[in-house]
C-alpha cells in the first residue's frame, strides 16, 4: 500500500550547505521529519555541484515521518547574474541597466533549465529566459 502524503515543503538550499539551522530546521521539524537525515542526503546529492549554488528542492513528507526529495535546476536569475557578471539585478528595471547578456547566453541557460521550464521547444525557453533577464534590468543583446 502507498504511503499517505502529509504535505510538501518547498525550499531553496545552497548546494552542499544544508544544515539544521533556519530555514531548513523549522520547516522539517514542524512536520516531524529527521532534519539531519535530510541534510546528509541533500549534501551527498549536491556534492559534485558548485558549492553555494541555490538549489530548489521539494520535500514530500509522509504520514509515517519519512520523506523523499526532488531537486530542480537552479533559478534562472542565478545563471543570468553569473552570465552578466553582476551581483544583483537593477533596482529600477527598464530604466537603469545592471548589465548585458547575449541571446546565445540566454539559449545556453534555457538548455540547462529546459526540464523545469514550461516551454515546448528551445526557442520558447530562450524567450522565457530573455524575459527574466529584462525583468532583472539586464539588457539582452544579439
Curated annotation (Swiss-Prot):
SUPFAM superfamilies in UniProt: Ribosomal L11/L12e N-terminal domain, Ribosomal protein L11, C-terminal domain
UniProt key word rRNA-binding: yes
Gene3D superfamilies per record: Ribosomal protein L11, C-terminal domain, Ribosomal protein L11/L12, N-terminal domain
Annotated keywords: Methylation, Ribonucleoprotein, Ribosomal protein, RNA-binding, rRNA-binding
An individual GO BP term: translation
Any one GO molecular function term: structural constituent of ribosome
Coiled-coil ranges (or none): none
InterPro entries on file: Ribosomal_uL11, Ribosomal_uL11_bac-typ, Ribosomal_uL11_C, Ribosomal_uL11_C_sf, Ribosomal_uL11_CS, Ribosomal_uL11_N, Ribosomal_uL11_N_sf
One Pfam family here: Ribosomal_L11_N
GO CC term (a single one): cytosolic large ribosomal subunit
Post-translational modification: One or more lysine residues are methylated.
Function, as annotated: Forms part of the ribosomal stalk which helps the ribosome interact with GTP-bound translation factors.
HAMAP family, per the entry: Ribosomal_uL11
UniProt record similarity statement: Belongs to the universal ribosomal protein uL11 family.
Assembly description: Part of the ribosomal stalk of the 50S ribosomal subunit. Interacts with L10 and the large rRNA to form the base of the stalk. L10 forms an elongated spine to which L12 dimers bind in a sequential fashion forming a multimeric L10(L12)X complex.
Protein's name in the database: Large ribosomal subunit protein uL11
Organism: Parvibaculum lavamentivorans (strain DS-1 / DSM 13023 / NCIMB 13966)
